[in-house]
C-alpha cells in the first residue's frame, strides 16, 4: 500500500465520483492548487522561511510538477473501470488518457491545501444530480465531508484532522463544473491517511 502525495490526494478525491461514472471529458481537466509552506518537505530552504513567504503568493513547477503523473494514473484507472463496466465514453485502447493541466501555488500559511479543479462533462448535468452522485459515492466515508449550497471548503477547518472537505459547483454560463477540496497536507495528505490505510489493512476501525 502506498499513500498518494498531498496534491494527488486532494485532486483524486475531488474528481473521483465524476471520473468513475464516466462523466468528465478527459481532455478538459484543469487543477489550480495552493499549499502551505510545509508542503515543500522537511528540508529547509530560503523561499519557505517566514520572511520570504509572508505576504507572498507564487506559482511553481508549472506544467512539470512531479505529482502530475500520479494524478493522471489514478484518474485513468477510474476512467478504465467505468469503461470495463460498459461505458463507451472513454477507452484506454483509443489512447484517450486524461491529461491534466496542473498549477500549484505556494501560499503564506504553515499547512493546508486548497485545490480547485475545473472540468467539462460529456453531457449537461444538473448540479443537484451531481451532488447526489457525490453523496452516493462517498456514503459511509467518515473522513469525507461534503459541502452543499454556496459554502466552500477552507483549509482552516481541516487543520490537524484527517478530513477532506469537498464542494461542487456548476458554471451554467460556460458549462464547466468546478470542484473544491481542502485538506491538511500533513495529516490527510500524509501521516493521517497512512494510519487510515494501516487500520484497514489490520482490520481495525478506520
Regions found by a protein language model. Give the residues of each.
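NAD(P)-dependent Rossmann-like dehydrogenase/reductase catalytic/cofactor-binding core
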Residues: 163-165, 170-206
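Basic phosphate/pyrophosphate-binding loop/patch that engages nucleotide-derived ligands
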Residues: 16-25
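Gly/Ser/Thr-rich loops at beta-strand to alpha-helix junctions
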Residues: 5-9, 37
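Residues that form or flank phosphate/diphosphate-binding pockets in enzymes
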Residues: 9-10, 125, 189
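C-terminal substrate-binding/catalytic lobe of Rossmann-fold NAD(P)-dependent oxidoreductases
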Residues: 27-30, 37-86, 90-179
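A short, charged, Gly/Pro-tolerant segment at domain boundaries
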Residues: 34-36, 206
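Alpha-helical scaffold segments in soluble metabolic enzymes
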Residues: 13-17, 70-74, 133, 193, ...
